[in-house]
């Protein structure tokens, strides 16, 4: 009888070990943000972002270990208003190592919401794996009475561990929604439903911890992207100028004097430019500073050769990219070429 009991014990132990071994390996990379924020009381709106470390975040949501083998590392501890090129390059290189050399099955990145869409799109163009990479954040600090971070983190891990997440590019997961890095944008300053895709809708959603997909990105990303940051230590300098009635051209002048490599315009309407800015844009393009037209309007495309004769002035139209994402693509495009026609092709394809 003792032998039978011992055999059963060993058998059950082996099953347990096998089940554990079959869990997808998910690495959580922490960068700070509101999801790691701390306030003095549960009802205060004032807080300090990025106070909690990665292990505190993991310990706060033990359920994330139910369906995945979880580990984590701290990349930086900042509010995402301070996100920069160095962190982007660090993230892209580290993610490529983890997925392609260290055998991880997926990545979750905790990140502030202010610039999350920019980081997501940068990684969408520079990660060299079709395994899931999911950015997650929160609109309320961890100490808030009704913090949204814990459930968002749980959901993000569920997405990263889901076999159907493969090949969908980098994703953003908040408020039960799964969104494409290319098309997601922040639409509300404080609401938990802030992240939306106003042009195409969600990639999927979560219900009772289950992931359901209803869409797939069509534009090139990740393993189909030509952009490789492996040997890069810095990125081209690209700025954004804003158009409005009676707009000042001083920002344009400043970027040109500082010898920026490219300039993106947040134009009015269909990417149109105030006259003073337009005149300097023509001059900048003639000086070898690539100029891209985008729009401050939240939906719709900036159309090539509409009211502006882009072919005549060698301007690039951003298509469906908003100004901040157009800046990301232009930075990477300039690592490949300064040919405006080729850069326009990138904007058409990505």
Model-derived features: positions:
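Internal gly/pro-rich beta-alpha loop/helix module
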Residues: 136-207
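ATP/NTP phosphate-donor binding region
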Residues: 21-97, 279
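Short Gly/Thr/Asp-enriched flexible loops that form oxyanion-binding sites at enzyme active sites
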Residues: 109-131, 273-282
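Bacterial Sec-dependent N-terminal signal peptides
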Residues: 1-22
